[in-house]
């Protein structure tokens, strides 16, 4: 895994980063209005099995199929993901709200994983049964920004479930996303 910091000295002078006073709480409150899918990110490998809830996940490109996951370097699971170099992004369905809370708290790992059914695909990372979608990935690049690492993850396998409704997080609350009939 290659780690690099965001280069600011290579920006043209006209687009150089300026110091702007943005209140931390105002920023967090505004970001709470940015709705997103709820995901459980899992890993398993030489460093052990771990998982956490994340909404900071998005597509990067489909060639090669790559997405990104943001992970706080102070998170208890950070070193496990860093050492294993593989992960699975499990996008939750509406019925997974309590599972999201388990993986988002201080619950011991064994209790988190015992609350659901899991399988594996290519990397050996836990794949959540009943997830809306699961992306089984290798971590190919890491960029450090502030308190977080941005993990670029290339999908080795993908599955999706057309029978489930999604789960979103908006304004610090869960919201079910209903699939429209086609």
UniProtKB/Swiss-Prot annotation:
One Pfam family it belongs to: Flavin_Reduct
UniProt keywords, alphabetically: Flavoprotein, FMN, NAD, Oxidoreductase
Gene Ontology MF terms: FMN binding; FMN reductase (NADH) activity; FMN reductase [NAD(P)H] activity; riboflavin reductase (NADPH) activity
Origin: domain of life: Bacteria
Signal peptide: none
Record's catalysed reaction(s): FMNH2 + NAD(+) = FMN + NADH + 2 H(+)
Catalytic activity, EC: 1.5.1.42
Single GO biological process annotation from the record: nitrogen utilization
InterPro entries: Flavin_Rdtase-like_dom, NADH-dep_flavin_reductase, RutF, Split_barrel_FMN-bd
Function comment: Catalyzes the reduction of FMN to FMNH2 which is used to reduce pyrimidine by RutA via the Rut pathway.
Similarity comment: family membership: Belongs to the non-flavoprotein flavin reductase family. RutF subfamily.
Protein name according to UniProt: FMN reductase (NADH) RutF
Gene that encodes the chain: rutF
